[in-house]
Amino acid sequence: MAHNLTGGQKDTGGAVINSEWVPVKTKALIVGEDLDTADSLGNNANADKIASPDNIKFSEKMRTLFIGEDSGNHVNNFLWAYNVDTKKLSRILSTPTGAECTGLHAVDEINGWTYIMSNFQHPGEFIKTASSDVKKLETLIKQNYNLSLIHI
């Protein structure tokens, strides 16, 4: 959500709020797109747009909002970077099937370097509930990468 903030506002009782950071208008900053039917990989939301944001971190230096997903709407959850100046949304990380992005942290300055850190938890959880989708994914993985999934 994006908020317009201002001072000089009053609460519902008419008392002045002692802050210059009072939200006076709110709108959706980034929205995803649900699909009417799942795509060929089993995604219930457009994989090129955000779904179920869960963890966020803002980097003032990069002017970027980092957003981790925890969604049953994407087969693989993603970590996104949204530049607040250009309004560009970029997918920068994909977790294993069923895992969620967590532990998100952006460090603006350590010895001249900037770091974006993230990890994931409970990989494979999706596999237990969506075996037909996993079989489709496994076929595509074998075709494209000559690999196979680890079955739990």
Please state what every model-predicted region is.
Residues I150-I152:
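Conserved small/polar residues in nucleotide/adenosyl-binding loops
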Residues A2-H3, Y82:
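Hydrophobic/aromatic beta-strand positions that recur at structurally equivalent sites within the blades
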Residues T64-G68, W113-S118:
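Conserved beta-propeller blade signature
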Residues G13-D48, L93-T97:
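Surface-exposed loop and turn segments in beta-propeller and other repeat-based domains
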Residues K88-V107:
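Conserved blade-ending motifs and adjacent loop-strand segments that build the rim/top face
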Residues E60-K61, D108-G112:
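Residue-level detector of Asp-centered blade-edge/turn motifs that repeat once per structural unit
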Residues N43-T86:
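Loop/turn-rich, solvent-exposed surfaces of beta-rich toroidal or solenoidal domains
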Residues G72-N73, P123-E125:
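Short glycine/acidic-enriched loop and turn motifs that connect beta-strands
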